[in-house]
């Protein structure tokens, strides 16, 4: 049946982001609402995890595509702040990493300016909901870091059914396979798994490439 979540008003969020194009609160809210990062992930995020060329945020358990608004914000902050500290979110005053409490307080002030009674976890949940409205379970599991079973248990009412172009693995199996491919990277095993999974190649076809 799922849960009922406290969701922000989209128009209000866009107004807040427009007022904060590259400030710390602008970065915090974009990372939570547009990228689905938790408060601890925002606190710990470092510049070497932001892949501007690949347009993704590389977290320990997942890679999250960079939304254009987030990319623009982080590019400007990178120019201004990257040489001062390796952390993405730092204080404008001290130029040091913000503790979690300061991140919550700064985001709260920005959200209150538009009467949004939500917190950073609510923004992460809203990210998951929006992803489920346009993508399948395995994809949302990959970008959110949540297991498919957790997503189904909490967010099932938000999933939009779409016709499948081809038979797929059971969602949890596909997510686990994706994790293995991520861990193997460009190794022989990783490439073989990727070719068999995504390109539907047979073992003999893969061997002929070697």
Where are these regions (language model features)?
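Conserved tyrosine-mediated DNA breakage-rejoining catalytic core shared by Y-recombinases
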Residues: 35, 40, 44-74, 208-210
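Short, basic (Lys/Arg/His-rich) helix/loop patches that form interaction surfaces
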Residues: 104-146, 160-161, 182-183
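Basic, Lys/Arg- and aromatic-enriched nucleic-acid-binding interface segment
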Residues: 7-35, 39, 124, 171-203
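A short, basic/aromatic helix-end/turn motif that makes direct DNA contacts
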Residues: 44-50, 141-149, 156-157, 196, ...
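Active-site/catalytic core of tyrosine-dependent DNA strand-transfer enzymes
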Residues: 67-116
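DNA breakage-rejoining catalytic core of tyrosine-based enzymes
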Residues: 1-13, 60-69, 82-85, 161-176
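Key DNA-contacting residues within the recognition helix of helix-turn-helix
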Residues: 43, 104, 129, 152-153, ...
